[in-house]
């Protein structure tokens, strides 16, 4: 299969193409003697290889751009003064320059080419071609995307999208090209190419394709979602879990009683819910065997660790965040035992769960949402972190990320809300807002109680529970649930005085109202204001 012609992309003089290498070949290539710098993988005593990604230990949203042309001009949700996002425009001249840099970097070299699928549903999946000069980057995409069978590879044909990773090349004249730095991640929706320059972070390839799926699917009547998903063991219904980083998406969807569809990116079409990916990309900071056995056990040969501290004996220090807090592992999804096989897809979702880690201590541990509230809280995409300030006081900082994934939305957020609710209405799915954060005790809600809440949602007992309505937010909350401490279900009961909750609730309600103003530029957004908090 090494007779691939890369000259049509402008890559010439290639000395050898290693096409869809096996895991054994990848292991040998990324650990072979003589590799230097960030190309070098270190074998750990768990069997997985660890690599370092240099100065970029996460995505670089400031360096993400789309070429503005006839294809994209009226479809992409462009950044604007009043509402900044990561979809920044560049012109044809800039594109020609960055593409030229990438093709020059990749020409006259020995290259890795990985052909893979994005999307587990045959009728909507994309054929991707990744071109790179670094072995472990080929390993990363082999883990993260859907690996074609030998027969599918033989009949792969032309890809739908091409990703050129030229992480060794720098954009020195970035200022005159209208870029942000020497690093650039640029998409051309007409040529269907993504170019990556001067960042080694693996996640740029993963999230790049998520941004593209987020562009295509809603325009074709499918929901595209930043969520994890699982199904019951009988495969009768799915549940989807939306949530920003650190809210428990991966942890809560990995459930011994259920089968995992995927942990991060999914579509929902007329047949059901499907994974975009063939692997998982889990955070491993402070990873502990007891509390996250599935992820722990997935770290073995063929898994790829990023930016972990590993000593000369190959021992991994998961608590060390000296390089970054965003230490990660990618592994093929079959490293997790409880998964949907052979294809990562499931039936229509019956439960849609929005996870928020509310550091303000206001949101109830679980609220049952109506259709309008579903749209409102989906567009709000709220969570909050506790950030240390200079005097050691820990203050909550709110994050509002539209659709629980604003960084990856290529179209206007209301489009994703529309598609999601359309699918929910068609299948009779219900939405729940689950707070995995803090309450009046100053402690985080226990994972035991949160799991009890998720169980009650999934087995339907929450729909039979007695309820009451919370002030300001009009949330319907259960007053008792099996296996859950009843004293936490109304957050007011966790404070010495309900007045303390009221004060915080007014503050948070005001923040929701202020944030939502940015969606009221169109009729769909205006109509939802009434579903939000009221002061």
From Swiss-Prot:
Sequence positions that bind substrate: 59, 201, 207, 328
DNA repair among keywords: no
Pfam families: PEPCK_ATP (PF01293)
E.C. code: 4.1.1.49
Binding positions for Mn(2+) per the UniProt entry: 207, 226, 264
Reactions it catalyzes: oxaloacetate + ATP = phosphoenolpyruvate + ADP + CO2
Major localisation: cytoplasm
Biochemical pathway: Carbohydrate biosynthesis; gluconeogenesis
One term of GO molecular function: ATP binding
Keyword Metal-binding applies: yes
Keyword set, alphabetical order: ATP-binding, Cytoplasm, Decarboxylase, Gluconeogenesis, Lyase, Manganese, Metal-binding, Nucleotide-binding
GO CC terms of this entry: cytosol
Origin superkingdom: Bacteria
GO BP, sorted A to Z: gluconeogenesis
InterPro entries for this protein: PEP_carboxykinase_ATP (IPR001272), PEP_carboxykinase_C (IPR013035), PEP_carboxykinase_N (IPR008210), PEPCK_ATP_CS (IPR015994)
Compartment list: Cytoplasm
Residues reported to bind ATP: 207, 226, 243-251, 292, 328, 444-445, 450
Family classification: Belongs to the phosphoenolpyruvate carboxykinase (ATP) family.
Classification via NCBIfam families: pckA, PRK09344.1-1, PRK09344.1-2, PRK09344.1-3
Protein's recorded name: Phosphoenolpyruvate carboxykinase (ATP)
Species the sequence originates in: Bacteroides thetaiotaomicron (strain ATCC 29148 / DSM 2079 / JCM 5827 / CCUG 10774 / NCTC 10582 / VPI-5482 / E50)
Top-level taxonomy: Bacteria, Pseudomonadati, Bacteroidota, Bacteroidia, Bacteroidales
């Amino acid at each position: 299969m090494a007779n691939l012609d890369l000259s049509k992309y402008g890559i010439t003089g290639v000395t050898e193409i290693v096409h869809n290498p096996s895991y054994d070949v990848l292991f040998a290539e990324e650990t072979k003697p003589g590799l230097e710098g960030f190309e070098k993988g270190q074998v750990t005593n768990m069997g997985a290889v660890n690599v370092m990604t240099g100065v970029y230990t996460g995505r670089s949203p400031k360096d993400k751009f789309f070429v503005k042309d006839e294809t994209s001009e009226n479809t992409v949700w462009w950044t604007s003064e009043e509402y900044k996002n990561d979809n920044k425009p560049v012109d044809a001249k800039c594109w020609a320059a960055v593409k030229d840099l990438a093709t020059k970097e990749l020409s006259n070299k020995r290259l890795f080419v990985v052909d893979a699928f994005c999307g587990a549903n045959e009728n909507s999946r994309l054929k991707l071609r990744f071109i790179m000069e670094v072995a472990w980057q080929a390993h990363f995409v082999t883990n993260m995307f859907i690996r074609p069978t030998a027969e599918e590879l033989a009949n792969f044909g032309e890809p739908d999208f091409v990703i050129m990773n030229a992480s060794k090349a720098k954009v020195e004249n970035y200022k005159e090209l209208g870029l942000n730095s020497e690093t650039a991640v640029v998409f051309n929706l007409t040529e269907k190419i993504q170019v990556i320059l001067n960042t080694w972070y693996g996640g740029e390839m993963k999230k790049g394709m998520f941004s593209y799926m987020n562009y295509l699917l809603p325009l074709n009547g499918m929901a595209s979602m930043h969520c994890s998903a699982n199904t019951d063991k009988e495969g009768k219904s799915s549940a989807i879990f939306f949530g920003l980083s650190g809210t428990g998406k991966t942890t809560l969807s990995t459930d011994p009683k259920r089968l995992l569809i995927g942990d991060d990116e999914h579509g929902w079409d007329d047949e059901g819910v499907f994974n975009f990916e063939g692997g998982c990309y889990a955070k491993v900071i402070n990873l502990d065997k007891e509390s996250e056995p599935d992820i722990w056990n997935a770290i073995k040969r063929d898994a790829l660790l990023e930016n972990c501290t590993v000593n000369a004996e190959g021992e991994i220090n998961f608590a060390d965040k000296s390089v970054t807090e965003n230490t990660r592992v990618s592994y093929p999804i079959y490293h997790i035992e409880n998964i949907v096989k052979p294809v990562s897809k499931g039936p229509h979702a019956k439960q849609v769960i929005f996870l928020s880690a509310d550091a303000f201590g206001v949101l109830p541990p679980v609220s049952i949402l109506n259709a309008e509230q579903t749209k409102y809280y989906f567009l709000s995409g709220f969570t909050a972190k506790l950030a240390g300030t200079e005097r050691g006081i820990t203050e909550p900082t709110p994050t509002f990320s539209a659709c629980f994934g604003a960084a990856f939305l290529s179209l206007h957020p209301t489009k994703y809300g529309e598609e999601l609710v359309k699918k929910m209405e068609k299948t009779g799915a219900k939405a729940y807002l689950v707070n995995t954060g803090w309450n009046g005790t100053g402690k985080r809600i226990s994972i035991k109680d949160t799991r009890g809440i998720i169980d009650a949602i999934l087995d339907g007992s929450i729909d039979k529970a007695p309820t009451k309505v919370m002030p300001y937010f009009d949330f319907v909350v259960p007053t008792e649930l099996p296996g859950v401490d009843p004293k936490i279900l109304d957050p007011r009961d966790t404070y010495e005085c309900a007045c303390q909750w009221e004060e915080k609730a007014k503050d948070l309600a005001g923040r929701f109202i202020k944030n939502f103003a940015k969606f009221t530029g169109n009729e769909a957004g205006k109509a939802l204001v009434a579903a939000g908090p009221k002061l």
